[in-house]
UniProtKB/Swiss-Prot annotation:
The Q motif is unique to and characteristic of the DEAD box family of RNA helicases and controls ATP binding and hydrolysis. The keyword Nucleotide-binding applies. This is ATP-dependent RNA helicase DRS1. The lineage of its organism: Eukaryota, Fungi, Dikarya, Basidiomycota, Agaricomycotina. Belongs to the DEAD box helicase family. DDX27/DRS1 subfamily. InterPro entries: DEAD/DEAH_box_helicase_dom, DEAD_box_RNA_helicase, Helicase_ATP-bd, Helicase_C-like, P-loop_NTPase, RNA-helicase_DEAD-box_CS, RNA_helicase_DEAD_Q_motif. Residues 109-129, 137-159, 167-199 have a biased composition (Acidic residues). Residues 208-223 have a biased composition (Low complexity). One of its GO terms (biological process) is ribosomal large subunit assembly. Its main location: nucleus.
Length: 808
């Protein structure tokens, strides 16, 4: 096809394709592809051969808690003291995590293999004589390598321990066995000791609780789409890989959407947080969005700050993935009060708080109330009902409206009417999923018998050095013991972090993030970390000592084997822990209980090494204490400077108030601590000492002569006390016989045989006049003796004049 194009300059003919359409009388477009240009050439992007389409529709790898930006927004203070720096100075070597040590060993082994291959190639290319010489040199190099390996004792021991790791595991697996028949008989005997509910208690519970309609409903929802949830929320659940609801979610979510009060209980790691967060977000999708509709509608109470941070992360993940316009506010200690008060002025939809900080804002933050609250959720409700939280919880309940919906969740939820009646529930429904089981199915519980408390720490170190090398949480009874064991772990070359109440909020969150990221292998914690925390990848939980309550043991071992995964718990059991051991075995299945035996040689070796580090531990603790005192002094100096420079501003601020007095607050705190400490069993030594004190008499162990002498001394002392008592009685009688006041008359002594004066016992009534200076009793009696009124005749002896008398 030939197209003629006309222009003012010239005519040209172009051969074009059949489907080409042009404009008539258009200007010629001359393109010179071969001429260079001053502009840089833009290369077309090449296709990536490894490109793959995302068939998941924007799905993530699931809800991954911790390891993110939890530390951001925490109130920054002075830089905390890093104990690892002090330990590294003592050791002379840095403390590395297990994966870093393993990576270094793999790199060293790879470099050695490459070196050997190069030497073999050179040996093959040479002559026979040269090969012989090279063989001698190789032997010399091997000798040098061996000598160098002997120089670094730590690396050699680590390599040998890695080689023996499989062997030791096999030996320990052979030593693991079920408990004997005697232990099973003891467990059976404990069944008869357990208290049974009386008929009156059952009747009270039937009247207090409402029946659960989901227990008899065979058509429980097997997917989230069957729950009539909104599309944004379904999209969020799908993107977070929540494919099917767990049993607690399938039963609790439909009831929560109906606005019923719920008591939810299920095993640890079964998704209880999503069970109350999903219906909350669904209800907030249909809230009033008008100008006057903004209000704080949901309150989630948590016993610890870390659990509150985790609940906020779950709620924010669901809201962001679903594109929901829901705002959260985190009210916990350790964060800035002013920032939280500013957030509360914007009226966020969901408040996630700890009780103390919430009451602080209710008392001191202007215009903040809970009058518009629709839903109240108490996570780990059994802990919130214990001593230490009861007063604060009652104060929060008073601030909430009666028409609210209340949901309580815990793995060890109680159904005691006496405790739940404080929360003003409205016909609550018990949603207890598998109440006979409190531990996960994938959990294997192992118990190690400890003969004496002196072998407890060496047994723990032997266990960590031989078998359990990473992703392990170790629970301790006290904060001081957890800190001391962190120093011991550092001296043994084990990378550990601590988590307890003596740390700042920044240190606590940083420890959780480091443990999640694998920077540290062991998390040494108190019961602060036993409830609710969901840390992905925890393989083992070790109980350094058994807790005082079975519920606390359940929450401790529940940090592993979560969401259908496998896990194991190892508990060091002493003689004082036999009762708790029976209870733990009773609630577990027979195939989940194992008896682990740690070789005595390993425990003895660790005990000897621990004795060598005893002085180093004391020096590190002393150095840390001195550093803390220096920082405290600097802080006091800085505080004084601020008081001088900003005195007017500081004193102009309104004082923060509390709903309790100082004594009441301290009493509440002491009650919680006493309840926690009192639940632990007493050690064997202290119990024996108490028995000795009760049995030992005051004459036990004395000879016959000393016994008589002691008895005579006691008799003389008793006689002297009686004589002194008699003398004191005589002195008191003489003192009472004296007049009470100098100006008062002495009482008359009655003669024998005369009758008693009837008016003697009557007190004379004195009125008027001011009190005497000597009147200490304030009776206002007159001074001196007062005579009776009488007429005085001044003309004695004279005759009175009268009418007609005396006149002559």
């Amino acid at each position: 096809m030939i197209i003629h194009s006309s222009s003012s300059n010239s005519k040209k003919e172009y051969t074009m394709a059949d489907d080409f359409i042009t404009t008539i009388d258009s200007d010629d477009e001359v393109s010179n592809y071969g001429e260079p240009s001053a502009l840089p050439k833009i290369k077309d992007d090449e296709l990536d051969p490894d490109f793959q389409f995302d068939l998941g529709g924007g799905r993530s790898e699931g809800l991954d808690l911790w390891g993110g930006d939890e530390v951001q927004g925490v109130k920054k203070g002075n830089e905390p003291i890093n104990v690892d720096d002090i330990i590294e100075r003592k050791r002379g070597k840095p403390i590395r995590a297990f994966k870093d040590r393993k990576r270094k060993r793999d790199e060293d082994a790879t470099s050695e293999d490459d070196l050997e291959e190069d030497e073999e190639e050179e040996g093959d290319s040479n002559d026979d004589s040269d090969a012989a010489k090279s063989g001698d040199s190789e032997e010399d190099e091997m000798d040098v390598d061996m000598s160098e390996g002997d120089g670094d004792e730590e690396d050699e021991n680590e390599i040998e321990s890695l080689k023996r790791e499989d062997e030791s595991d096999e030996e320990e697996e052979e030593e693991e066995d079920d408990y004997d028949e005697e232990g099973e008989n003891e467990v059976v005997d404990s069944d008869s000791e357990s208290e049974e509910e009386t008929a009156a208690e059952i009747a009270r519970k039937d009247a207090f609780f409402s029946s659960d309609p989901t227990t008899t409903d065979p058509t429980l929802p097997s997917s989230f789409t069957a729950m009539n949830l909104s599309r944004p929320l379904l999209r969020a659940l799908t993107s977070l890989q929540f494919t099917a609801p767990t049993p607690i979610q399938a039963r609790a979510i439909p009831l929560a959407l109906l606005g019923r009060d719920i008591l939810g209980s299920a095993v640890t790691g079964s998704g209880k947080t999503a069970a109350f967060m999903v219906p909350i977000l669904e209800r907030l999708c249909y809230r009033d969005r008008g100008k006057g509709g903004a209000a704080c509608r949901v309150l989630v109470l948590c016993p610890t700050r870390e659990l509150a941070v985790q609940c906020e992360a779950v709620g924010k993940a669901l809201a962001e993935k679903g594109g929901l316009d829901v705002r959260f506010a985190l009210l916990v200690g350790g964060l800035s009060l002013n920032a939280q008060a500013h957030t509360l002025r914007t009226l966020p939809d969901i408040l996630i708080a700890t009780p103390g900080r919430l009451i602080d804002h209710l008392t001191n933050t202007p215009s903040f109330t809970l009058s518009a609250l629709d839903v109240l959720v108490i996570d780990e409700a059994d802990r919130m009902l214990e001593a230490g939280f009861t007063d604060e919880l009652e104060e929060i309940i008073k601030a909430c409206p009666r028409s609210r919906q209340t949901m309580l969740f815990s793995a060890t939820m109680t159904d005691s009417v006496d405790e739940l009646v404080k929360l003003s529930l409205d016909k609550p429904i018990r949603v207890f999923v598998d109440p006979k089981r409190n531990t996960a199915r994938g959990l294997t519980q192992e118990f190690v018998r400890i003969r004496s408390d002196d072998s407890r720490s060496p047994s723990l170190l032997a266990l960590c050095k031989r078998t359990i090398r990473e992703k392990c949480i170790i629970f301790f009874r006290s904060k001081a013991l957890a800190h001391q064991m962190r120093i011991v772990f550092g001296l043994f070359g084990l990378k550990a972090a601590e988590l307890h109440g003596n740390l700042t909020q920044e240190q606590r969150l940083q420890a959780l993030n480091d443990f999640k990221a694998g920077t540290v292998d062991y998390l040494l914690a108190t019961d602060l970390a036993s409830r609710g925390l969901d840390i992905k990848g925890v393989e083992t939980v070790i109980n350094y000592d058994m807790p005082g309550q079975l519920a606390q043991y359940t929450h401790r071992v529940g940090r592993t084997a979560r969401a259908g995964r496998k896990g194991r718990s190892v508990s060091l059991v002493g003689e004082a822990d036999r009762k708790m051991l029976k209870a733990a075995i009773k609630q577990a299945e027979a195939d989940q209980v194992r008896h682990r035996i740690i070789p005595s040689e390993a425990v003895t070796a660790m005990k000897e090494k621990l004795e060598e580090f005893k002085d180093d531990i004391q020096e590190i603790l002393k150095e840390e204490k001195e550093e803390k005192l220096l920082r405290q002094a600097d802080m006091e100096i800085k505080k004084g400077q601020n008081m001088v420079e900003h005195e007017a501003e500081i004193f102009s601020r309104p004082a923060r108030t509390w709903f309790q007095s100082g004594k009441e607050k301290q009493a509440s705190k002491s009650a919680g601590k006493d309840a926690y400490v009192g639940s632990f069993p007493s050690t064997g030594k202290s119990a024996e000492k108490e028995k000795e004190k009760l049995k030992r008499g005051k004459y036990d162990g004395l000879s016959r002569r000393l016994k008589r002498r002691k008895m005579a001394i006691e008799e003389d002392a008793a006689d002297a006390a009686a004589a002194r008592k008699t003398e004191m009685g005589i002195r008191a009688a003489k003192k009472n016989a004296l007049p009470k006041k100098i100006t008062e008359p002495q009482p008359r002594l009655e003669k024998a045989g005369k009758g008693k004066d009837k008016k003697k016992g009557k007190a004379r009534r004195v009125t008027g006049g001011k009190g005497s200076a000597f009147d200490s009793e304030g009776k206002k009696s007159h001074e001196g003796m007062r005579a009776k009124p009488a007429k005085v005749n001044l003309e004695k002896g004279k005759k009175k004049g009268g009418k007609g008398k005396g006149r002559k």
